[in-house]
UniProtKB/Swiss-Prot annotation:
Protein name: Transcription factor PIF1
Annotated SUPFAM superfamilies: HLH, helix-loop-helix DNA-binding domain
Biased composition (Polar residues): 415-426
GO cellular component: nucleus
Mutagenesis or variant effect for S202A: Loss of phosphorylation by CK2
Assembly, per entry: Homodimer. Interacts with the photoactivated conformer (Pfr) of phytochromes A and B, PHYA and PHYB. Also interacts with APRR1/TOC1. Binds to RGL2, RGA and FHY3 (via N-terminus). Associates to PTAC12/HMR/PAP5 which acts as a transcriptional coactivator. Binds directly to PCH1 and PCHL; this interaction facilitates its association with phyB and its subsequent light-induced degradation.
């Protein structure tokens, strides 16, 4: 692949030369420029400027064919190409066409069409100059076009269209300056650097190239520039998007952290409130329970004191002993009630545990006074009916009856008379045994009718006995 070195210059010093060179063109060729196609090329042939349409790939025949320059490898440079030089007078600028404000991306993105290939001719070499030593050590290192980026302000502010013309002018001016002492290969190598103008990143086309009337650079090596432009746009967008993503992620993490802190604080407050409420309820329940227990114990103590007062001779302090005493006392009371409910004719039975309570029972019933035993038989009616008195029958038939005198007051039992309780059993007639002698101490007081009848019978019996003794004495004497 061979590169053609175009003859162009964009310095302001060569504006007059450009105007003078355009005057040599016929008017027909000038008027037809730009009518058929926007992309035109100006060639220098035999001291004349020739217009060539790049899309149609047509060029005017020339008397002398253009000389081709082989592509120069940066590692190897032929010595034959070092003798070729370009004079300043033979270079004419053709890039002074009016610029258009089109899409900014068109300056960086190109299609790999065959129309991007430019041709150039070198008219003549005037004089041979000494070769210029060019070594690999003196060359600046080629920069990596994949790492350059554009400012984010152009994308954010939408001013890409405004910076397009300025960037294109800067690119043309930086890339089209060729020193008279440099070879085309050296100029190409020096112009193949990435330069930054007015805060914007731009790339210079290596090896020179053709330019259209819009002021846009058409690269000689189209594939490399295409990769460069595409990478620049991709890198710039990828730089913007990660930053936005990082900002969003940071904000999202901050919101999540804030939400988490608020949730944790609320949960802690809720737990504390629940614990405090539960502890308060438990303390209140404990207080109520303690108060009820205290009241219940007080009532029990009062009842035990009252029971201790009711039980006689109860000196127990503990509750169990007091309850035992109360149980025994209730049993004794039950027995007393049974004895009182029985009739007078039925002798109550003596239980084993009644001896200790007998004095208390007598005091409660008014029986604390000793009861004197009667001096007569308790049932005189039955005895009188069973055994009639013989003296009365004998005296009834023998003579007039004598009136029964009243009994001797000294012989009648008087309640006010002092009675000796230490004396033995009452005196009964000889050969008579009392059948109720064993129950006399427990039997209640005798009915009053029995006493009256008993008081009359002994006197009559005693009177009759005295009469019998007198009659018996008289009968023996007479």
């Amino acid at each position: 692949m061979h590169h053609f070195v175009p003859d162009f210059d964009t310095d302001d010093d060569y504006v007059n030369n450009h105007n003078s060179s355009l005057n040599h063109l016929p008017r027909k060729s000038i008027t037809t420029m730009g009518e058929d196609d926007d992309l035109m090329e100006l060639l220098w042939q035999n001291g004349q400027v020739v217009v060539q349409n790049q899309r149609l790939h047509t060029k005017k025949p020339s008397s002398s064919p253009p000389k081709l320059l082989p592509s120069m490898d940066p590692q190897q440079q032929p010595s034959s190409d070092q003798n070729l030089f370009i004079q300043e007078d033979e270079m004419t600028s053709w890039l002074h066409y009016p610029l258009r404000d089109d899409d900014f991306c068109s300056d960086l993105l190109f299609s790999a069409a065959p129309t991007a290939t430019a041709t150039a001719t070198v008219s003549q070499v005037t004089a041979a100059r000494p070769p210029v030593s060019s070594t690999n050590e003196s060359r600046p290192p080629v920069r990596n076009f994949m790492n350059f980026s554009r400012l984010r302000g152009d994308f954010n502010n939408g001013r890409g269209g405004e910076s397009g013309p300025l960037l294109s002018k800067a690119v043309v001016r930086e890339s089209t300056q060729v020193s008279p002492s440099a070879t085309p290969s050296a100029a190409a190598s020096e112009s193949g650097l990435t330069r930054r103008t007015d805060g914007t990143d731009s790339s210079a086309v290596a090896g020179g190239g053709a330019y259209n009337r819009k002021g846009k650079a058409v690269a000689m090596t189209a594939p490399a520039i295409e990769i460069t432009g595409t990478s620049s746009s991709v890198v710039s967008k990828s730089e913007i998007e990660p930053e936005k993503t990082n900002v969003d992620d940071r904000k999202r993490k901050e919101r999540e952290a804030t939400t988490t802190d608020e949730t944790e604080s609320r949960s802690e407050e809720t737990k504390q409130a629940r614990v405090s409420t539960t502890s308060t309820k438990r303390s209140r329940a404990a207080e109520v329970h303690n108060l009820s227990e205290r009241k219940r114990r007080d009532r029990i103590n009062e009842r035990m004191k009252a029971l201790q007062e009711l039980i006689p001779r109860c000196n127990k302090s503990d509750k169990a002993s007091m309850l035992d005493e109360a149980i025994e006392y209730m049993k004794s009371l039950q027995l007393q009630i049974q004895m009182m409910s029985m009739g007078c004719g039925m002798m109550p039975m003596m239980y084993p545990g009644m001896q200790q309570y007998m004095p208390h029972m007598a005091m409660g019933m008014g029986m604390n006074q000793p009861i004197p035993p009667p001096s007569f038989m308790p049932f005189p009616n039955m005895l009188a009916a069973q055994r009639p008195l013989p003296t009365q029958t004998h005296m009834a038939g023998s003579g007039p009856q004598y009136p029964v005198h009243a009994s001797d007051p000294s012989r009648v039992f008087v309640p006010n008379q002092q009675y000796d309780p230490t004396s033995g059993q009452p005196q009964y007639p000889a050969g008579y045994t009392d059948p109720y002698q064993q129950f006399r101490g427990l039997h209640p007081t005798q009915p009053p009718q029995f006493q009256n009848q008993a008081t009359s019978y002994p006197s009559s019996s005693r009177v009759s006995s005295s009469k019998e003794s007198e009659d018996h004495g008289n009968h023996t004497t007479g």
